[in-house]
């Protein structure tokens, strides 16, 4: 069984308390539980990780690329938080690792402040989804299953 990696970036550990009018009252633990349950329905194990550090996210993306080559990983659902709008390094990591990525955002970033309208992740991602709340993670997992190329173990 191939797995799926869900990566959450800076400040997503504060879900449930940070701007609940924007992000809702669900916690990161709720997100991770939802993702594991949806993964099980889809026939994939889901691993969830969160970091406030860009370099850690990059290291995980590199690891994911190697796991994809081995046929162990289908791809990544990535909510890079504010790094979406600033990180060329995450863009380059995704491109370099050749791992299918669905970029996801809990809020509709395009209806928010102008600085949130540009994504450095989007050009490297297979698809971009936003504004569906925490429940949208389940949809992002389904999207990844639909668009990721089939993998064979090397």
From Swiss-Prot:
Belongs to the type-II 3-dehydroquinase family. It comes from Ralstonia nicotianae (strain ATCC BAA-1114 / GMI1000). It holds the Pfam family DHquinase_II. InterPro entries: DHquinase_II, DHquinase_II_CS, DHquinase_II_sf. Catalyzes a trans-dehydration via an enolate intermediate. Pathway: Metabolic intermediate biosynthesis; chorismate biosynthesis; chorismate from D-erythrose 4-phosphate and phosphoenolpyruvate: step 3/7. One of its GO terms (molecular function) is 3-dehydroquinate dehydratase activity. The lineage of its organism: Bacteria, Pseudomonadati, Pseudomonadota, Betaproteobacteria, Burkholderiales. It is an enzyme of class 4 (lyase). Its EC number is 4.2.1.10. Keywords: Amino-acid biosynthesis, Aromatic amino acid biosynthesis, Lyase, Plasmid. It comes from the Bacteria. Homododecamer. Transmembrane segments: none annotated. HAMAP family: AroQ. GO terms for biological process: amino acid biosynthetic process; aromatic amino acid family biosynthetic process; chorismate biosynthetic process; quinate catabolic process. Substrate binds at residues 79, 85, 92, 106-107, 116. NCBIfam families: aroQ, PRK05395.1-2, PRK05395.1-3, PRK05395.1-4. This is 3-dehydroquinate dehydratase 2. It catalyses: 3-dehydroquinate = 3-dehydroshikimate + H2O. The active site is at 23 (proton acceptor), 105 (proton donor). The record marks 18 as: Transition state stabilizer. CDD domains: DHQase_II.
């Amino acid at each position: 069984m191939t797995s799926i990696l869900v990566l959450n970036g800076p400040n997503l550990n504060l879900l449930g308390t940070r701007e609940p009018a924007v992000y809702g009252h669900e916690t990161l633990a709720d997100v991770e539980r939802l993702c594991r349950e949806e993964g099980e329905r889809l026939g994939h194990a889901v691993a969830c990780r969160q970091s406030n550090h860009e370099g850690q996210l990059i290291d995980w993306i590199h690891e994911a690329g190697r796991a994809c080559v081995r046929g162990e990983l289908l791809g990544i659902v990535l909510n890079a938080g504010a790094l979406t709008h600033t990180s060329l390094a995450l863009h380059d990591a995704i491109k370099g690792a050749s791992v299918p990525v669905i970029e996801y955002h809990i809020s509709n970033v395009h209806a928010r402040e102008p600085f949130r309208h540009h994504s450095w992740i989007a050009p490297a991602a297979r698809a971009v989804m936003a504004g569906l709340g925490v429940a949208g993670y389940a949809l992002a997992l389904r999207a990844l299953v639909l668009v990721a190329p089939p993998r064979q173990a090397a």
